Every structure is written in C-alpha cells, then in structure tokens.
C-alpha cells in the first residue's frame, strides 16, 4: 500500500516540477516578446530621435559639431608604434 502511495506522490511532484518549468518558460517568452515589441517603437538612432521629438533641420549643425568634437577626443593609434598617441 505504501509503495503505491509513494509512486503517486513521486509522479505528482514530477508533474508539479514540469508544470512550474513550463509556466516559467512561457512567462519568460512572453516577457521577451513584449520587450521586443516595445523596443521596436523606441527610436534608436539620433536621426530617428530628431524625427520623433520634432526637432527641425536647424539643429543639424550642432549635431555635426558635437560629432567632430567627439571624434577628436578619441585617442588615435600610431601605426608605427602600436600605442595610443596623446
């Protein structure tokens, strides 16, 4: 009698573990899908942001100046020495 009861408990715990694993998997897939869905609506590039934020073409020279400044701040590799130049 005890063996039958133990077998039922074991199969019930295996079923519970399977159900919990399946529920967690479905939950993670739903969260991942929703994150992809919401990320597709967010602008990713600077040009996309300017379209969505309503900025005009007059703001473009500032962006170009900022890009030049950012590029000049990047240390460059000296091809002969393989080190960064100051």
UniProtKB/Swiss-Prot annotation:
Which pathway does the database say it acts in? Glycan metabolism; exopolysaccharide biosynthesis
Location in the cell:
Cell membrane
Q: Cellular component GO terms, alphabetically? A: plasma membrane
Q: Would the keyword Ligase be found if you checked this record's keyword annotation?
A: no
Q: What parts of the sequence cross the membrane?
A: 18-38
Q: How does the entry describe its membrane topology?
A: Single-pass membrane protein
Where are the stretches annotated Disordered? Answer: 44-86
Per the entry, what this protein does is: Inhibition of exopolysaccharide synthesis (EPS) and nodulation ability (NOD).
Write the protein's name: Exopolysaccharide production repressor protein
């Amino acid at each position: 009698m005890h063996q039958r009861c133990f077998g039922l408990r074991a199969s019930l715990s295996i079923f519970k573990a399977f159900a919990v694993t399946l529920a967690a998997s479905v939950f993670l897939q739903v969260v991942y899908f929703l994150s992809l869905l919401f990320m597709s609506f967010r602008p990713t590039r600077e040009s996309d942001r300017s379209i969505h934020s309503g900025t005009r073409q007059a703001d473009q020279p500032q962006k170009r100046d900022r890009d030049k400044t950012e590029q000049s701040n990047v240390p460059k590799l000296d091809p002969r020495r393989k080190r960064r130049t100051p």
